[in-house]
Design a protein with these regions (language model features):
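Alpha-helical segment proximal to the catalytic Tyr-Lys
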Residues: 126, 169-174, 230
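Short C-terminal tail/terminal secondary-structure segment
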Residues: 92-95, 146, 222, 233-250
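Residue(s) in the substrate-gating loop at a strand-loop-helix junction
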Residues: 141
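Conserved glycine-rich cofactor-binding loop
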Residues: 15-17
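Substrate-binding pocket helix/loop in short-chain dehydrogenase/reductase
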Residues: 96-98, 105-110, 191, 202
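Active-site helix of classical SDR
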Residues: 121, 157, 165
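C-terminal helical subdomain
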Residues: 118, 180-183, 200-228, 232, ...
Length: 250
């Protein structure tokens, strides 16, 4: 157990990948955690792997307001508090030029990547954080900081999430700190198409010589929900293996 033992976190989109890595890091330091995900079977497997004595799961779609309400209600019922929210649930269902982007698909991306994060933030604020404090971490992307060809809807949604982070940080202060993490390519099923069959080539572009893994983001989230970051809010922590260094100057 650590200094944070007894704290409670809600992590969305956490049955696998980055969300699971975040939940794993928080459980390891002594937190109790509620994880969400769309697939009930995958969620149960994740709960069992993380430890059913400290973790509960609530299945549903992140953009569904009824699911948001249920998840927050369940974590309050099970643990009596919700100190931390990590908005990780996201989608990137389309690849192609922005000129041909289906606007209905773009709306779906924004519903999941931005509006759901706002919905969960509102609900955790009213349920606990408004009176008791806490921290929120939004999982954004380097695609929200620099142009990312052929995944425009995803990139624009993550840019919006970064701005939402700043808005929430301003309005929720001083009780609640709100920050974002912007990963580059992390080895998950979600990002598999970006490196499958060419991982060595993809990794060579990174000054640190490898792609990210979920625990890299878990460590960053653990920092941003710890006392070590008590004077940090409204910021975006880029966790990118140094890929932005390649832009150079001039």
């Amino acid at each position: 157990m650590t200094e944070l033992s007894g704290k409670v976190a809600l992590v969305t989109g956490a049955s696998r990948g980055i969300g699971y890595g975040v939940a794993e890091a928080l459980v390891a330091r002594g937190d109790r955690v509620c994880i969400t995900g769309r697939n009930e079977d995958a969620l149960k497997e994740a709960v069992d792997a993380l430890g059913a004595d400290r973790v509960i799961g609530v299945a549903g779609k992140a953009h569904d307001e009824a699911h948001q309400a249920e998840a927050v209600a369940r974590v309050m019922e099970a643990f009596g508090r919700v100190d931390y929210l990590v908005n990780n649930a996201g989608t990137n269902p389309v690849f192609g030029p922005i000129a041909d982007l289906d606007l209905n698909v773009a709306r779906k991306v924004f519903e999941t990547n931005v509006i759901s994060a706002l919905g969960f933030a509102q609900r955790t604020w009213h349920a606990w954080q408004k009176d008791n404090g806490g921290a929120i971490v939004n999982i954004a992307s380097v695609a929200g900081i620099a142009p990312s060809p052929f995944i425009a809807a995803y990139g624009v949604s993550k840019a919006a999430l970064i701005n939402l982070t700043q808005q929430l940080a301003h309005e929720f202060a001083p009780k609640v700190r709100v920050n974002a993490i912007a990963p580059a390519v992390v080895k998950t099923k979600f990002a598999q198409a970006l490196y499958e069959g060419r991982e060595e080539e993809a990794a060579a572009a990174y000054p640190l010589g490898r792609l990210g893994v979920p625990s890299d983001i878990g460590g960053a989230a653990a920092f941003l929900t710890s006392g070590q970051s008590d004077w940090v809010t409204g910021q975006t922590l880029v966790v990118d293996g140094g890929i932005f260094l390649n832009a150079g100057v001039g």
